[in-house]
């Protein structure tokens, strides 16, 4: 049996879950900014960081890395990723995005589609190491109805 963890969503609601990605895929929790899903992947706004357009693209099954994708998942992934990125540009006007594959998980492959806004560069710089301070700033200062 998987150990449960307590998470706190961007509204301050606490939930006990074993696997956040499974809880999202099975709709046991509803993340803010729920987006379309594909046959093999789910996309949603980050559960704790209220930056508009910050998308987590996660596998529906338990894998950690792209080298575990089936052929069908490989094809679905690139098409879904392209569709999400296009929507970020067209709907939100996001011109720059950092794609970060994070294998620091026990359960689901996931990739961050992290939008780069002018305020981030002004406050924290442009380099990749500026992402964490921008996320922390958003958690502390951007929990507004508009960003949820």
Residue ranges of each PLM-predicted region?
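HIT superfamily nucleotide-processing domains
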Residues: 1-148
């Amino acid at each position: 049996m998987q150990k449960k963890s307590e998470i706190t969503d961007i509204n301050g609601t606490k939930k006990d879950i074993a696997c956040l990605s499974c809880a999202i895929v099975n709709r046991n929790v509803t993340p803010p900014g729920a987006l379309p899903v594909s046959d093999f992947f789910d996309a949603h706004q980050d559960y704790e960081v209220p930056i508009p357009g910050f998308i987590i693209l996660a596998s529906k099954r338990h894998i950690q890395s792209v080298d575990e994708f089936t052929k069908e998942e490989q094809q679905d992934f690139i098409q879904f990723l392209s569709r999400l990125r296009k929507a970020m540009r067209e709907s939100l006007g996001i011109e720059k995005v950092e794609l970060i594959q994070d294998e620091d998980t026990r359960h689901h492959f996931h990739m961050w589609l992290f939008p780069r806004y002018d305020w981030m560069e002004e406050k924290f710089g442009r380099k990749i190491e500026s992402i964490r301070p921008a996320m922390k700033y958003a958690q502390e200062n951007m929990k507004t109805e508009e960003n949820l």
